[in-house]
Amino acid sequence: MTTQRLVHMANQVAGFFSSYSEGEAIDGTFTHLRSFWDPRMRREIEAHLAKTGGAGLTPIALAAVKRLAEKDTAAQKSA
């Protein structure tokens, strides 16, 4: 799956939650990505974040991907 497709998908998820408060939208998007995206998809979107700063992601999707990257990094360090 291409990075551009993953960006589009993350933005779609964030769009679903856009009617919620900002915090709830970020939480919902993060939870969806963490629960339903394959680890390879998560690694790819995290690599996109590291490489480009999250180019193309909406603010809600960007915040959720940043949180995802932080949680995955913390989990790797504690393992």
Model-based region annotation:
Residues 1-31, 35-79:
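Intrinsically disordered, low-complexity, basic-enriched segments
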